[in-house]
Amino acid sequence: DEKHNLKIVLASDSIQYISAEENYVRIYYLEHAKARNYVLRSSMKALEELCLENGLVRCHRSYFINPQHIKTLRKEQEGVVYAELDASELQHVPVSKRYLDTVSALL
């Protein structure tokens, strides 16, 4: 967490994506092929360097995503782009125009 009182140890390749929720982040990951999530009191800014060092990329102001788990990028009729992940029970992750080229280049 932000005060370094709590740590969660996950293999970076098990992390599918991270989403921001006010003063918290929710980490979505796979454990023994089952989808799990963990809420941590932290900001996206505080996690950014750690995420980038471990292969996650920012795809939206509120999301980091692991390119290893992206199955496809899909553009909706409204023009919104979503990353579909390889675990079907997880939601689609939005990819903003600002980060679309970066995410696309990693696929």
Describe the predicted segments one by one:
Residues 38-42, 92-98:
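A short macromolecule-binding patch
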Residues 1-87:
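Conserved binding/recognition cores within well-folded domains
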Residues 36, 49, 92, 102-104:
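Intrinsically disordered, low-complexity acidic/polar segments
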Residues 97-107:
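Primarily interfacial, aromatic-capped hydrophobic alpha-helices that serve as membrane anchors
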